[in-house]
């Protein structure tokens, strides 16, 4: 039984499901599409930053260095590393008693 295709209706004897055990191809297709939609939605919410970054920039990791002399490549790498390095002098150590 799928929660996506069940329809409960009141009868004299209580509640019962009309579509229980249905082998209608339309019901089966709707169930499969619903389950796939749910899976894709969950994956999108979990990995949306990665997915959209991949769509926007592709698999590029940074600007191309093709045709650039090695000395300039090294200078660029050093600038990037300096931008990432953190100066420990900006932090204040607080000790709780």
UniProtKB/Swiss-Prot annotation:
Residue spans, topological domain Virion surface: 1-22
Site (Seems to be involved in pH gating) location in chain: 41
Keyword set, alphabetical order: Disulfide bond, Host cell membrane, Host membrane, Host-virus interaction, Hydrogen ion transport, Inhibition of host autophagy by virus, Ion channel, Ion transport, Lipoprotein, Membrane, Palmitate, Phosphoprotein, Signal-anchor, Transmembrane, Transmembrane helix, Transport, Viral ion channel, Virion
Membrane topology: Single-pass type III membrane protein
Keyword Protein biosynthesis included in the entry's annotation: no
One Gene Ontology CC term in the entry: membrane
InterPro entries, per database record: Flu_M2
Summary of activators and inhibitors of this protein: The M2 protein from most influenza A strains is inhibited by amantadine and rimantadine, resulting in viral uncoating incapacity. Emergence of amantadine-resistant variants is usually rapid.
Site positions for Essential for channel activity, possibly by being protonated during channel activation, and by forming the channel gate and the selective filter: 37
Key word tRNA-binding present: no
UniProt-listed Pfam families: Flu_M2
Family per record: Belongs to the influenza viruses matrix protein M2 family.
Domain remarks: Cytoplasmic tail plays an important role in virion assembly and morphogenesis.
Protein name: Matrix protein 2
GN (gene name): M
